Design a protein with these regions (language model features):
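Feature for intrinsically disordered/low-complexity regulatory segments and propeptides
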Residues: 1-88, 92
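Intrinsic disorder/low-complexity polar-acidic segments
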Residues: 83, 87-226
Length: 227
């Protein structure tokens, strides 16, 4: 199994691949950006052939710190910087946001960050959901945000979190990114409200008592529906 991790940080529990910087407490966005090795920007550069002629309609996404080419994209591609991903998550969750993991995959082509959401109690069990933000800088994928119980520590767990999430939002890197991010905030805030309501309903059902006669009626009705 390949982790594809370039840089990352994690809180306490070491990932299976053993890579990354361990911290003892979940970090705020400013510290998480640095500890995850994500404190760099993506710059767009023109592309030229050997003779010096410019290739029209395409740009190269280049990492600011080392000049690494992350990918070739169309000139319609809108960059979402790593720091903007953290700002989005800070604003969405609000309060004292804390990050559990974050990092760079595939030599900077993909990044993720995982923030802890407020703990909930559902029928006596504590549930600790995360908000996962994933972004690609090589033009291969969309901006994706989801709610997940999965602790993301590598490319495989990121794919698992995104592919199994029941509540998520995604958009391509074109058009008005600011408007799309506002749409994401509204969508995910509704999903968060849904989780709160789900916890209330589950507790209500758990505390509802029914008689043997009522249970028998429910069973008979269920059998009739299957016939």
């Amino acid at each position: 199994m390949v982790a594809n991790v370039e840089t990352m940080f994690y809180v306490r529990e070491k990932p299976w691949h053993g890579l990354g910087v361990e911290v003892q407490e979940a970090l705020n966005s400013a510290d998480a950006l640095k500890m995850a090795g994500l404190d760099w920007e993506v710059k767009q550069r023109n592309i030229q052939v050997c003779g010096g002629a410019k290739i029209e309609n395409y740009k190269a996404n280049v990492r600011s710190t080392d000049g690494r080419v992350l990918g070739v994209v169309s000139d319609r591609y809108q960059i979402v910087q790593n720091k903007d991903a953290f700002s989005f998550t800070d604003e969405l969750i609000g309060g004292d946001v804390r990050y559990e993991t974050a990092g760079s995959l595939q030599n900077g082509k993909k990044i993720w960050l995982l923030a802890k959401m407020p703990e909930r109690e559902v029928v006596g069990d504590k549930v600790e959901p995360y908000l996962c933000f994933s972004n690609t800088h090589d033009g291969s994928g969309s901006i994706r945000v989801c709610m997940t119980p999965i602790r993301v520590v590598c490319n495989n767990t990121l794919n698992l979190a995104l592919n199994s999430a029941k509540r998520q939002w995604a958009t391509k890197h074109v058009g008005n990114i600011d408007e799309k991010m506002q749409e994401a905030r509204m969508c995910l805030q509704l999903a968060d409200a849904y989780m709160d309501e789900l916890a209330v309903c589950a507790d209500r059902l758990a505390n509802t008592t029914i008689t043997d006669e009522q249970l028998d009626k429910i069973g008979r009705a269920s059998c009739r529906e299957r016939v």
